[in-house]
């Protein structure tokens, strides 16, 4: 059910034209809450919307209002339920709702290695694909960011990928073995997307504005 929720949130995030960081913080809040507090399946979408609302307040200048978030749930919840869930999340997490995200590390790397636009979007495609699978939370945000950059560099034939093993890029020395292991899992996830019922990430990155990198990836 978590995978279905995150897939839906990717679609919602795109619909409202929100910042990348907002999506990653939303997923961080959801996973932190789920690890600390049991929740009924019927309330999972409410958790997702409330987490998105909290993230928007942190990351965005202009963001969806409560009535808009209620609308995207097709009226499954009312305003009072959303506010109550928002307060409960903050209480359970003790306002610890911000953490470094994979996109932040990836942005540092993409600039350091002068990724072109297609390479940059490829990495974003890989990262958002990794959000769907709960098993990927065993890796830190820095590992995901570096590993996605590693996959991009290998995929595109950028030979200086070995520089990623140095702590000079992200101020953290990540073992080569860990990067390669995470990269293999990311490749496996992306490969399986074409046959998955969870389509939001693949559909998003099949759009011209993202240079159709999902299709480019499948064709190469």
Q: Each predicted region: which residue ranges?
A:
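Acidic, serine/threonine-rich low-complexity regulatory regions at protein termini
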Residues: 1-49, 53-220
């Amino acid at each position: 059910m978590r995978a279905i929720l995150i897939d839906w949130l990717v679609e919602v995030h795109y619909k409202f034209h929100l910042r990348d960081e907002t999506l990653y913080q939303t997923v961080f809040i959801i996973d932190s809450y789920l690890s600390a507090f049991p929740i009924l399946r019927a309330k999972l979408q409410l958790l997702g919307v409330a987490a998105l609302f909290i993230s928007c307040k942190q990351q965005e200048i202009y963001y969806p209002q409560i009535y808009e978030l209620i609308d995207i749930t097709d009226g499954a919840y009312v305003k009072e339920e959303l506010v109550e869930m928002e307060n409960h999340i903050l209480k359970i997490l003790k306002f610890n709702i911000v953490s470094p995200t994979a996109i932040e590390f990836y942005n540092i790397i993409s600039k350091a290695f002068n990724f072109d636009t297609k390479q940059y979007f490829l990495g974003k495609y890989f990262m958002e694909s990794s959000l769907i699978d709960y098993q990927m939370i065993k890796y830190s945000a820095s590992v995901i960011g570096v590993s996605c950059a590693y996959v991009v560099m290998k995929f595109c034939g950028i030979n200086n990928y070995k520089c990623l093993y140095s702590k000079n890029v992200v101020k953290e020395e990540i073992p080569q073995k860990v990067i390669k292991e995470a990269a293999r899992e990311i490749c496996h996830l992306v490969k399986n997307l074409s046959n998955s019922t969870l389509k939001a990430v693949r559909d998003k990155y099949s759009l011209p504005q993202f240079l159709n990198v999902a299709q480019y990836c499948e064709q190469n």
